[in-house]
Amino acid sequence: MSQIDENIRYGGAANETDGEDAQRKAQEREAKKAEVRKRLEEAGQKKQKKGFLTPERKKKLRKLLMNKAAEDLKTQQLRKEQERVKVLAERTVALPNVDSIDDHAKLEAIYNDLFSRLCNLEEEKYDINHITTETETTINQLNIEVNDLRGKFVKPSLKKVSKYDNKFKKMAEAKKEDGSKNLRNNLKTVKKESVFTQIANKKKSDKPEWSKKKEEKKEESAPEPVIEPVEEEETAASEGEEEEEEADEE
């Protein structure tokens, strides 16, 4: 009795069930941990597959590059403007106050100085233009040679011409060739008849009713053809030949 009481008091059979529940819970906990670990590994693999440049990072990088390009363009334009102002300041000369000068010799000297300076600038401009045209022609020739070696054909720069200009030119040439040419000759001739002529032609072609009735009566009263024997046909043919001979003799 004492052992049974102790088992009942300290849990006995209940201890076995509690141990099974604890074991099952531990297994469930381990399974949940393994599932969470697996999910974390999959998420890490997905992040690794995406790489460093995610769409958000690409967007930010594109924005930064655009801002940098805009800043560089502004600085380049400012630098060019400063260089232009500097070159103009070096090349241009401050004009003297001509209104306050009364001496003719001084005015003539100023005029000669400015004129000689202008001539020099025009010569430099002509030389620069000549050099640029030569370089452009050489570049074009080299491009043509390179394309020929590669086997490519460069489209020539075609001039835009209005189609109406060509039409007017052709018309002018045709007028020069045939000055007295009548355009009505090319038109199609259509024969027109008046109403009166149509009625007259209709009357000529139509037969009167009394003639139509006569023809119908003749057709009705006409005898039916009779088939004659062969001997009668031969006698008729001989009689016809004799009549023809008599007619020839007469």
Curated annotation (Swiss-Prot):
Pfam family for this entry, one: Troponin
One Gene Ontology term, aspect cellular component: muscle thin filament tropomyosin
Alphabetized UniProt keyword annotations: Actin-binding, Muscle protein
Biased composition (Acidic residues): 229-250
Residue ranges, annotated region (Disordered): 1-59, 194-250
SUPFAM superfamilies hit by this protein: Troponin coil-coiled subunits
Tissue: Strongly expressed in body wall muscle during embryogenesis, reduces during the larval stages to adult. In late-stage larvae and adults, expression is evident in the proximal gonad of both hermaphrodites and males.
GO annotation, biological process: backward locomotion; muscle contraction
Protein's job: Troponin I is the inhibitory subunit of troponin, the thin filament regulatory complex which confers calcium-sensitivity to muscle actomyosin ATPase activity.
Homology family: Belongs to the troponin I family.
Name of the molecule in the record: Troponin I 1
The gene coding this protein: tni-1
